Amino acid sequence: MFKIQNSVLFTILVLNFSLIVYPNNKTNDDKSNVIVGANQISKYENLLQDKRIGIVANHTSVIFRKDLGYTHLVDSLIKLDFDVTKIFAPEHGFRGTEPNGANIDDEIDIKTGLKIISLHGTNRKYGEIDDGDLKDIDILIFDIQDVGVRFYTHISTLHYVMEASARNDIPLIILDRPNPNAHYVDGP
């Protein structure tokens, strides 16, 4: 009798554990309830008022509204009359059009006229911000979708941005986005 009870208890524990550990891969509407940080400007706009803003962004830095579709975070902040001063672009560039490992030059964004500082150019560690580029910045925003794999440079870029922010005593807002590959974790 005792052996049967232990077997039943063990089976129940294994089933419960497997429900927790193994992901539920079916698609449901709950995923549409995720609201990314960029879509919640109203929650942090008081931190941006009367500040010169630097934005670390790329083509994934978008806001979605059912009535307007996709709008880039930079365009949205400018439309709301925030003082976006500079854009810092990671590997693949601000618009995401550059190939892997390309040395990208600084440029001017055609749409906004803002200076884009390449964080993946010559004479710099990939993702590193030069202190001189932060002289006219009061606050930094980081909004880049990561894909949850180790070899992507975006998480390293965030690391360097955090270091530069701390070194220059500049507040940093990190706008979170869900990891699209979060259901599967593997490796050493």
Predicted regions and their residues:
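Bacterial Sec-dependent N-terminal signal peptides
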Residues: 1-30
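N-terminal phosphate-binding or glycine-rich loops at protein starts, especially the Walker A/P-loop
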Residues: 33-82
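A short helix->loop->beta-strand "cap" motif at the edges of active sites that frequently abuts
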Residues: 82, 167-171
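Short internal beta-strands
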Residues: 83-92
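Glycine-rich oxoanion-binding loops at beta->alpha junctions
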Residues: 105-137, 149
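Short acidic catalytic loops
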Residues: 138-147, 173-176
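Glycine/threonine-rich flexible loop motifs
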Residues: 146-158
